[in-house]
């Protein structure tokens, strides 16, 4: 009787083990289907989100990359007609990279490189978020939010590479705090070195990302050493305040990273660039330095709201709140910081989401995976993604069907100048937005989107070229006389505007300027005589 009962129990256990093993195999299979489906869908979406039309910085990037390979880095400007302006080459390594791609594949190659870099960023985010949260569905959803949030910043600029580097930085910090492996510290040093050479302007943000971790460590030390009171009890209840001794190694690495600024061909520029930029007046004029318009960043708003809202109902890591709060304050002051908020903030977004489900015993990951791995779900998901991507591409194609937007960049006017004028010896006043396109075509410019080059802080001049450009319609005769301008290429109509530009009307009505060329968007004038104006700059 006992043997029979024991045998039955063994059979029952074997059946349970077989059932459990079968469920595990099914779950493993469903996870593979989920991952493959997600990767396909997010890839389709990302590819169609990348704008085909090139941005103005790309043009000077190509030209500077060529200059570096041919002549090296001499810390001088070679493309404006202003004499002996110093130039910092803030993303020299990326310039070389883009020029080499341009040599191989032209504008198409550059467009493809932007897609590839964006895909690398997205794939890595998905991988990193899964490693940190251990929730596949939350990682996928968070990656989707990040893709939409960052898509507006994806273009052939050095920032696209720096996005990948910052994502790596957050991941390496998290992994080091989790398992203490020293290899992550070496990777962090390497990231600092690469940023110094590939996108110098954002190097200070490398150090900013460390700050929430240090703040959490200091607060944890204080709370754990103090006697319990209302404040400490509240903090212990609401936040995970375990003291991680690995933080001291992170602090050491951050200090060592400061010296990576010496390992560049740019001399001491890494230590002065941000200070000079903040002191310069380009902050007043450049769009990416302006205050954020929240209506244009809905997915970032969703991310911020979710972190704060869920932190009310679950115990979270306080570094996530420090990170989100600090980056939100930065984003309010400057649009360029919204990308850093979207990038670093997505790690906080995913972790808070995961902690909410864990702390409230909401086991939904497997349920979502099983549902989304069904045949009908996979087909519907792919079809919806294709429809979304097609709609995005159709809209973008209507707005900007080509690599070069002829309403923004004077393609035909440039051809006219090169065919009819001694273009290398004229002193051409031009608009900021298309100066880079002119210098790509070997036409010396008055100004271009290397904005800092033309401020007093960088030029060392006692007058400000950028200020003079912005005030041109107020006192154009004085400005044109001071810079000995012989020709002017300006917008006849600014992109998106229906009215003629004020400066075009002024010059058209002035008999001292001859209209040499015009089309629907641009006009080229030549000055035909000088006026007696005394020029003084205080």
PLM-predicted stretches and their roles:
Residues 125-148:
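Transmembrane-helix signature of polytopic, membrane-embedded enzymes
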Residues 175-193, 248-251, 318-325:
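Short hydrophobic alpha-helices at membrane interfaces in multi-pass membrane enzymes
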Residues 362-419, 441, 449-451, 471, ...:
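Membrane-proximal, lumen/periplasm-facing interface regions of secretory-pathway glyco-
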Residues 461-520:
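Periplasmic/luminal catalytic loop of GT-C fold multi-pass membrane glycosyltransferases
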């Amino acid at each position: 009787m006992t043997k029979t009962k024991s045998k039955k129990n063994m059979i029952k256990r074997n059946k349970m083990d077989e059932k459990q093993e079968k469920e595990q195999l099914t779950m493993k299979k469903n996870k593979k289907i989920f991952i493959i489906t997600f990767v396909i869908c997010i890839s389709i979406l990302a590819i169609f989100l990348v704008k085909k039309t090139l941005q103005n910085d790309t043009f000077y990037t190509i030209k500077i990359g060529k200059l570096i390979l041919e002549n090296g880095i001499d810390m001088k400007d070679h493309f404006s007609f202003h004499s002996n302006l110093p130039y910092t080459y803030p993303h020299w390594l990326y310039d070389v990279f883009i020029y080499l791609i341009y040599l191989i594949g032209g504008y198409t190659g550059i467009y493809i490189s932007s897609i590839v870099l964006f895909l690398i960023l997205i794939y890595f985010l998905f991988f990193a978020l899964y490693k940190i949260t251990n929730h596949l569905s939350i990682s996928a959803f968070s990656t989707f939010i990040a893709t939409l949030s960052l898509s507006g910043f994806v273009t052939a600029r050095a920032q696209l590479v720096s996005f990948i580097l910052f994502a790596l930085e957050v991941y390496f910090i998290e992994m080091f705090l989790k398992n203490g492996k020293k290899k992550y510290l070496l990777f962090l040093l390497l990231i600092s070195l690469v940023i110094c050479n590939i996108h110098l302007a954002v190097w200070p943000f490398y150090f900013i990302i460390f700050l929430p971790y240090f703040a959490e460590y200091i607060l944890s030390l204080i709370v754990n050493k103090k006697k319990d009171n209302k404040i400490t009890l509240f903090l212990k209840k609401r936040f995970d305040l375990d003291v991680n001794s690995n933080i001291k190694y992170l602090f050491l690495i951050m200090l060592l990273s400061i010296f990576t600024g010496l390992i560049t061909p740019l001399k001491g520029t890494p230590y002065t660039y941000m200070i000079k930029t903040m002191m310069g007046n380009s902050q007043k004029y450049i769009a990416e330095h302006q205050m954020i318009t929240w209506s244009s960043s809905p997915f970032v708003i969703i991310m911020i709201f979710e972190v704060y809202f869920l932190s009310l109902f679950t115990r979270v890591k306080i570094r996530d709140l420090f990170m989100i709060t600090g980056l939100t304050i930065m984003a309010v002051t400057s649009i360029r910081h919204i990308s850093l908020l979207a990038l670093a903030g997505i790690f906080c977004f995913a972790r808070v989401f995961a902690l909410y489900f864990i702390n409230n015993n909401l086991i939904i990951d497997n349920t979502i995976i099983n549902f989304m791995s069904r045949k009908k779900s996979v087909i519907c998901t792919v079809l919806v993604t294709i429809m979304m991507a097609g709609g995005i591409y159709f809209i973008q194609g209507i707005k900007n069907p080509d690599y070069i937007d002829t309403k923004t960049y004077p393609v035909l006017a440039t051809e006219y100048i090169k065919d009819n004028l001694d273009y290398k010896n004229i002193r051409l006043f031009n608009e900021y937005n298309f100066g880079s396109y002119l210098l790509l075509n070997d036409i010396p410019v008055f100004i271009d989107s290397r904005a800092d080059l033309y401020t007093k802080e960088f030029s060392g001049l006692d007058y400000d070229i950028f200020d003079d450009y912005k005030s041109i319609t107020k006192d154009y005769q004085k400005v044109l006389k001071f810079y000995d301008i012989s020709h002017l290429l300006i917008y006849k109509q600014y992109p998106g505007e229906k009215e003629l530009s004020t400066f075009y009307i002024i010059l058209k009505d002035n008999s001292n300027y001859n209209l040499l060329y015009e089309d629907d968007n641009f006009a080229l004038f030549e000055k035909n005589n000088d006026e007696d104006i005394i020029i003084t700059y205080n």
